[in-house]
Amino acid sequence: TRDYKDMLNQISSLGFNTIRMPFSLQAMRSTTTSGIDYGGGKNAELAGKTPQQVMDIIIDEAARKNLMIILDNHSQADDGFMFDLWCGHAGFTETDWVNTWTSLATRYASKPNVIGADLKNEPHGSATWGTGAANDWRRAAELAGNAVLAKAPNWLILVEGIEGQVAGGQQLDRHWWGGNLEGVRDNPVRLSRANRLVYSPHEYGPGVDAQPWFSDPNMASILADR
């Protein structure tokens, strides 16, 4: 393990300018951290800090290295389980999720290097698009996205896709988790500031999973369609 400053230095030296910083809803409510190596004086500034305070420190250090930050709600609980929806795991509700984003937007709106919110990592499974139901990701993204923009109007709002279950049907049978944006054509995400919206589908190569289109003889045209 390494010191966080050393890692930020390497990221900068490699020419990257933006970090997607994951967090869990549980961490933002916790008073203690775990998994940080303090051996040999590493990460001394993080000792005794809450997860929120650790985030503060890393964001400020990133700013000193001209690194931008996009916050990413990667999971609900600290177990890292990739639950399909943005709520409903480990007792967290949709209100908890929106309130967490509102709190983060309020806290970091004045930080010039915090530039965006990736609202939910890879919605999949029971997540739908454009149905208007409780599990409609488009509806939830509008709810949280507009809550963020009310506090941080200049942030980018990253909205990933889903996996399946698009209202009115979809052209392709299979998609990656977070990769299905077919529903956008008929049901786009509506934000209070339309120019802050970034559709952010997740796509992978065959090393992650041998999706059928990778072995299809018409792969070139399939990729063009995607």
Question: Where are the regions that the model predicts?
Answer:
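An active-site-proximal structural segment forming one wall of the substrate-binding cleft
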Residues: 2-19, 23, 27-119, 136-149
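Extracellular glycoside hydrolase catalytic/binding regions
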Residues: 88, 95-116, 120-226
